[in-house]
Amino acid sequence: MNAPLILLTAGGTGGHLFPAEALANALKAAGCRVALATDKRANAYAGSFPADEIVEIPSATPSGRSVPQIVKAALMLAQGTLKASAVIRQMKPVVVVGFGGYPTVPPVIAASLLGVPTVIHEANGVMGRANRLLARRATVIATGFANIKGVPANVPGRMVQTGNPIRPAVLEAARQPYAGLSTDEPFRLLVVGGSQGARVMSDVVPPAIELLPEGIRSRLSITQQARGEDLERVRAHYSKFGVTFEAEPFFKDLPHRLAQAHLVISRSGASTVAELAVIGRPSILVPLPGALDQDQAANAKTLEDLGAAIVCPQTEFTPERLAREIQSLFQQPDRLTRAASAAHSASIADAAERLAQVVLQLVPSQHNGKSP
């Protein structure tokens, strides 16, 4: 008997693909085959994705307000649903799992129309628009947080909290305990802006470092993710005042660097928050502004409420404010240690296995021999 095939579908950014990758590893360990349906943005990440097959499904985000934009997006989603239907008929997955973003809409709708069980996973503290659209069709809704907002009526009875699946590389990095800041080692600062970078980090962090007293600045060792177009000015700024730094558009070993950090300055996407919790590192979080759902603000609040993070809205994220926060934490290293411990208390390290069990419970009985 062939191993059951599970079709995962995710938008082509790290925030959607990383938890899908973690689930794929857990499902393969349980004896399943895995395929991935995504969009063209996934090329930067798909090379390491443990899928037996990867297919590109047309999609669009209906974000415009004009009638032509809405019609164009609707037509793209309809086209994607037709292609997804053909893919599902050909591949014959036994369950389809969506990880949010509009690229998941065509495969999940197609699966529900064809009678294939579906799971959607909501990683954020507020249910996203695509998942809200799919929630009433989904067989099960898995969540990263216990009490998420924006859930449609008549859905909560099908919800289960699994946590946000974590990649093996992050779990490996989590084995390194937080060392705390001592007087004879560098103060390691990690600055990241999510999988797609964030210009505000390049605008604010280097000038903030320049404002710090020389005694603190000389102790810093900075690793900063910067967009390609911002890279030279970030490097030039740090070089100007002699701080130890490394700046690149992308770090393949980011989990290792996260584990090495004494303090992380970051956006607060769901994957980032989950990784900060599992590895257990203190952070200054700057939620992405302008999002309709304010999902990053909700994610950040979960760590702030535990004392694991300082949350700074982007309107208040100035060089002066950031310099004050860094100086205060440097001068009170026990705060960093307490925040690291608080972050770790929020972790669900086995979230991938929990979600895999939810998926495997939907596998038809003729395949049950492949389930644990």
Regions found by a protein language model. Give the residues of each.
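An amphipathic, basic-hydrophobic alpha-helix
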Residues: 66-95
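C-terminal alpha-helical cap of glycosyltransferases
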Residues: 348-372
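C-terminal "capping" alpha-helix adjacent to the active site of nucleotide-linked donor transferases
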Residues: 310-313, 317-334
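Donor-nucleotide binding loops and adjacent catalytic segments primarily
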Residues: 24-29, 36-37, 42-53, 57, ...
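Acidic donor-binding loop of glycosyltransferase active sites
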Residues: 93-95, 259-273, 281
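A short, well-ordered alpha-helix in the C-terminal region of glycosyltransferases
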Residues: 335-349
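Glycosyltransferase specificity loop/lid
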Residues: 4-75
